[in-house]
Amino acid sequence: MSDQAPLVYLIYGIPGSGRRDVLFDLIDGGLEGKEQVLYFHPEGEATSPFDEQLEALDTVSIVNWKLSDASVVHDQIDAAPEKIIFLAPGNSDPADAAEAIKSWTDLNNCQIARIITVVHCAFLSENSAAKAWFDACIHFSDVVLLNRREGVNNKWVKDFEVGYRKQFSPARFLMVKKGRVANPLEVLEPEARRLSLYFDE
């Protein structure tokens, strides 16, 4: 690890939501190859076209990890990163992932920077029962990225965001277009905007 406390990011989202597209964009567009990144890739996830692109980045080291009893279990780390990014297992309980990452961060003297949820809008618009899972993710999140909106009514997207505004959610809701966000630095800015105070305890 470097002398300064590395900043830790956690990305929630279901498989197929474009998490790794966004991850590549944040690293490539937000860090511009200037900082060493340790990317925790969840075991058992289906491959993504962006896996090879992430592996090709000179500043990125990749380590496999899994959740076990709300704890982080990972392969050996040989990097000294400035930024650490955990991709949460797509089928995991958001609370378990939050507990695991907080414990790992505290143990390794790191600092939580931001929690990000990538929303698969097309899936959620057709599977309302999944909203409780996304609610849990967004409860912990500073930034909510609305992705996979193809074929989704604009009113649904607007109503989705307004629903959280009515609950006084302080999170930023941003659109993803073709796997990219408008301003990666805005997403990575280590400013807490989450409803949950769990990571601040």
Model-identified regions with their sequence ranges:
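Phosphate/Mg2+-binding loops and adjacent switch elements
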Residues: 85-168
